[in-house]
Amino acid sequence: MSNTFQDLIMLLQNYWAQQGCTIIQPIDIAVGAGTSHPMTCLLALGPEPIATAYVQPSRRPTDGRYGNNPNRLQHYYQFQVILKPSPHNIQEIYLDSLKQIGLDPTLNDIRFVEDNWENQTLGAWGLGWEVWLNGMEVTQFTYFQQVGGLECQIVAGEITYGLERIAMHLQNVENVFDLRWNKGAFGYITYGDIFLQNEVEQSTYNFEYADANLLLNCFDFYEKEAQKLLALDKPLPLPAYECVLKAVHNFNMLEARKAISVIERQCYILRLRTLTKAVAQAYYISRQSLGFPMCKRHKKRR
């Protein structure tokens, strides 16, 4: 049973480690979702197997509300699981994970609602479901069909837990800032103790003070830098991908500042999709040139 936000994370990590997942660390770049981590987005391509789980801090500048909204944040946490090939009983495994954190599926209204997923900037989409817990969406299930505009050879199953929403239900609180993060040497530390000031200040920056001209220039810089890295005799797809992620964040900031029109928005999305596709192709070729090393290890274990 998870009594704190910290407990919730640790229980999920322990559960998925027991299922054979490698527990890794988040990518140290501002991203809008756990899917953007290269261990999900890039390794979903090709034949190499994956069983990975991690917490990913996520930023969506337009979702900020100056700390005045009880359940809407510009910075929040996801718990991400990626399994390739996707196990046939992935839903049962997921439901068992809910039991481990203190949610009994027989005592709660848990529904799988069809909701196919798409990330336009990453050129990715998949078939999937939202998981609703007593009327509130808490998880997204996705079976990847395409990433970076490339077809996935093997379908990967992705599970994305919304940690704050799950924790609010477990702790029976209506305001995210009232969540107990952990019980330390000086008593309970709340989510608000750690993040409320950050939400207020980051919302103020995102909506009011971020320099739109600087953001436009940064977008152009990271786009050119990614193109340069991909044009090398020996391309560097991973550094290029990091440039793409930085360009995506600048794009999200431009949206928060209302600095681009609807037509311009579509042009920026197309530029990002074009870049991501080039990165995906270069990454696939680089893994192929290495002989898809994770496939070799998988065969040895078998």
Swiss-Prot record:
It catalyses: tRNA(Gly) + glycine + ATP = glycyl-tRNA(Gly) + AMP + diphosphate. GO terms for cellular component: cytosol. It is found in: Cytoplasm. GO terms for molecular function: ATP binding; glycine-tRNA ligase activity. Its main location: cytoplasm. GO terms for biological process: glycyl-tRNA aminoacylation. Keywords: Aminoacyl-tRNA synthetase, ATP-binding, Cytoplasm, Ligase, Nucleotide-binding, Protein biosynthesis. SUPFAM superfamilies: Class II aaRS and biotin synthetases. PANTHER family: GLYCINE--TRNA LIGASE, CHLOROPLASTIC_MITOCHONDRIAL 2, GLYCYL-TRNA SYNTHETASE. Belongs to the class-II aminoacyl-tRNA synthetase family. This is Glycine--tRNA ligase alpha subunit. The gene is glyQ.
